[in-house]
Structures are given as structure tokens and as C-alpha cells.
Amino acid sequence: MSQLSTIIEQAFENRANFTAADCPADIRQAVEEALSGLDNGTLRVAEKIDGEWIVHQWLKKAVLLSFKLNDNKPIESGDLAFYDKVDTKFAGWTEEQFKEAGVRVVPPAVARRGSYQAKNVVLMPSYVNIGAYVDENTMVDTWATVGSCAQIGKNVHLSGGVGIGGVLEPLQANPTIIEDNCFIGARSEIVEGVIVEEGAVISMGVYIGQSTRIYDRETGEIHYGRVPAGSVVVPGSLPSKDGKYSLYAAIIVKKVDAQTRAKTSLNDLLRAD
């Protein structure tokens, strides 16, 4: 793997020196190998090791290089036609392949090649971008979007219209991460590499980026870029220092309890084979 990452890193540094037409074969092969690994889940842009999230920047660079190395081409889907550089993930899949993957894909959900969905993932009419990783038993509900290289944990519910930010444009250093057992309420947006830690519940209509104040009303502490594990978060505001106006903030109102869990529990019937 070190050889693969070295080729990608060097190619990215020298990307101005070649085009899709004259790209060296070893670079093209390395980019394809990286995308295949992202697509089948053997590689991922970020992973938790010894309690810390480690970002493999070289894989993000491989994704960016793939746009340079591939030309746009017509992509057909029934009566619809598209023109893009990235194939859709499930194009040409057989019933056997879907059964083996254990993923349910409701039309017209779209996942790009280079994204991964683990067993018992349900894709309602939604969009999953290249480099994203969606772990087991997670539902991506209607009109939700999972951005490029975003990391979604196990047993997560992304409600209708949720937006999980990507890293490619505007270019971000780290992917947005939703850890295991989280619930993200309808129309909420989590972007700019924010980490929502395990078991957190985000209410409907909460918007969190790196500059968003995340205020814990119990302790008075303000967090940036991280929602602590087990938090229940709602939209709110905090007063300015002079008291003349208020600015948006995300408010931690409590820790998850049995009542919260009952309201946000997953329905196994929707994930049955």
C-alpha cells in the first residue's frame, strides 16, 4: 500500500506535467486501483484507529486525479442521458450482485463509482458521491446527499433532505464524519469536516460548519467542529457581547436518554432481506 500511496502523492505534486492523453501508465493504474479500493470498501479516506480519526489524504488526491485522467462521456439510464467523468456505481449490476452486496437501492437513488455502501444500507432516492463510505445498517433517506469522501457510520439515519458536506469543492482538508448510531434530522446540514460523535442526535434544521458555535447549555462550554458523543442538538442562537443582536448557534440541550432513543430508533423491518 505504501508504494500505491507514493505513486499517487508524487503524481498529485506533478499533476501539471501530464494530461489525460499522456498520463504515465503507472499513474493511471494507481488511480484506478485506489478508486476500486474505495468502491469495494477495502480502502477508505478516513478511519478510526485507536480512538482517533486518521485521514488518508493520498486517497482524496487519487479521487481528484481521477477527474483529470478521465474525459466526460455519455451515460445512459433508461430514457435519461447524462454526461460525466464518473460512472454510476450500480450500472450493469445483476440481481446476484445486489444480493451479495446486501444493499437496497430505491429508484432514482444514485451512488457514484468510488463510493461504498456496506450490508443492509438503504438508499432512498438520494445521492452518494465518490469517495464516500456508508457503513452497515444505515439509511440515507429521500433527497439526502452524502458528499465526496464523507464517512457515515453504522446504524445511522440520515433523514430527508439532509446534506453531509464533501471535500472536493470547496476543497476541504478533512472529510465530514458521522459516527455510529447517530440520527441526523430532516434538512440539517453537516459540512466542512465536522465530526458528529457516536450516538448524537441532531434535530431537524440544524446547520453545523467549522465556525458554528455548538453551545452546551448544561456546562456553558462552546465546541467548534465537533458534536460530543451522545448529545441532543437543536437550532438556536446566542447573544452578541453587546447584547444588540443574536447569531445562529447549535445548542446541546441534553444527553441522549431512553425517550430520545425511542423517538429515533431504527426500524429493522425496513432493513430485512
Curated annotation (Swiss-Prot):
It holds the Pfam family Hexapep_2. Pathway: Amino-acid biosynthesis; L-lysine biosynthesis via DAP pathway; LL-2,6-diaminopimelate from (S)-tetrahydrodipicolinate (succinylase route): step 1/3. Its EC number is 2.3.1.117. The keyword Amino-acid biosynthesis applies. GO terms for molecular function: 2,3,4,5-tetrahydropyridine-2,6-dicarboxylate N-succinyltransferase activity; nucleotidyltransferase activity. Its main location: cytoplasm. Signal peptide: none annotated. InterPro entries: DapD_Trfase_Hexpep_rpt_fam, Hexapep, Hexapep_transf_CS, THP_succinylTrfase_dom1, THP_succinylTrfase_N_sf, Trimer_LpxA-like_sf. It catalyses: (S)-2,3,4,5-tetrahydrodipicolinate + succinyl-CoA + H2O = (S)-2-succinylamino-6-oxoheptanedioate + CoA. It is found in: Cytoplasm. Keywords: Acyltransferase, Amino-acid biosynthesis, Cytoplasm, Diaminopimelate biosynthesis, Lysine biosynthesis, Repeat, Transferase. GO terms for biological process: diaminopimelate biosynthetic process; lysine biosynthetic process via diaminopimelate. Belongs to the transferase hexapeptide repeat family. Homotrimer. This is 2,3,4,5-tetrahydropyridine-2,6-dicarboxylate N-succinyltransferase.
